[in-house]
UniProtKB/Swiss-Prot annotation:
<dbReference type="GO" id="GO:0016024">
    <property type="term" value="P:CDP-diacylglycerol biosynthetic process"/>
</dbReference>
<comment type="similarity">
    <text>Belongs to the CDS family.</text>
</comment>
<feature type="transmembrane region" description="Helical">
    <location>
        <begin position="55"/>
        <end position="75"/>
    </location>
</feature>
<comment type="pathway">
    <text>Phospholipid metabolism; CDP-diacylglycerol biosynthesis; CDP-diacylglycerol from sn-glycerol 3-phosphate: step 3/3.</text>
</comment>
<keyword id="KW-0812">Transmembrane</keyword>
<feature type="transmembrane region" description="Helical">
    <location>
        <begin position="170"/>
        <end position="190"/>
    </location>
</feature>
<keyword id="KW-1208">Phospholipid metabolism</keyword>
<keyword id="KW-0808">Transferase</keyword>
<keyword id="KW-0443">Lipid metabolism</keyword>
<dbReference type="InterPro" id="IPR000374">
    <property type="entry name" value="PC_trans"/>
</dbReference>
<keyword id="KW-0444">Lipid biosynthesis</keyword>
<feature type="transmembrane region" description="Helical">
    <location>
        <begin position="248"/>
        <end position="268"/>
    </location>
</feature>
<keyword id="KW-0594">Phospholipid biosynthesis</keyword>
<keyword id="KW-0548">Nucleotidyltransferase</keyword>
<dbReference type="Pfam" id="PF01148">
    <property type="entry name" value="CTP_transf_1"/>
</dbReference>
<keyword id="KW-1003">Cell membrane</keyword>
<feature type="transmembrane region" description="Helical">
    <location>
        <begin position="193"/>
        <end position="213"/>
    </location>
</feature>
Amino acid sequence: MDDLKTRVITASVVAPFVVLCFVSYESLIGLVSAILILAGYELITLEMKERDARFFYVILLALYPVLYGLVFEEPTQPLSILFITGVVFSLITDKDPSQVFKTVAAFSIALIYVTFFLSFFLPIYRDFGAANALLVLTSTWVFDSFAYFTGLKFGRTRISPRYSPRKSLEGVIGGFLGVVIYTFLYRLVVNDLLSVNVISFRTFLPFAATVAIMDTFGDIFESALKRHYGVKDSGKTLPGHGGMLDRIDGLLFVAPVSYIVFKILEGVVR
């Protein structure tokens, strides 16, 4: 109960600030970069022990949304530049050839899994508007909450006993239904009352399914990473939630797939 209370307090403090960052494209870029500094540092720290080197790689990770959002039009351009920079830095600083591979592997995973995936919020915002970008974010919060309490009450069928023993099919179904209800209410307020375009009713189920499935596998994947490194949490950034990576693990899979779903249903979204 104390842990749940801590989680609620932390969320109550952090959530309003995060939502406010969606008021402009530039503030969203700043938010993504700030999150990448924390989550990227946590992930890279699991593999790299050299403190100065870790900071350099984290700076590269945080630069991606700035370069992609403000300088380059294609996402692969800054991605390639940052990857090559990281490889060259490793070749210069790592004395042991075997360490070069470990360093580049860790940096590559962080660059794709954390940086590239989270930065999909930028094209979602740019192509489909702030309301839909915020919907993607808040829907993961709703899914996590509904899945947690439903699983706590009715959870019987374990999805991944090896990596995430407490995650149940019943919890996922509860989270899915929660997202459907939330998306309906979100559209009712944002679209019908505020006259801001949000995904249409026919898109609710594909979107809710995307959130439920991708959030679940995002969480399982991060659990597998933590088991590999023998840690319970990725960090201690957010009291009650663990590290920043623990908080956004599902979101990292949800954001890119949601963008693809929106692209496929672009006529519906617009």
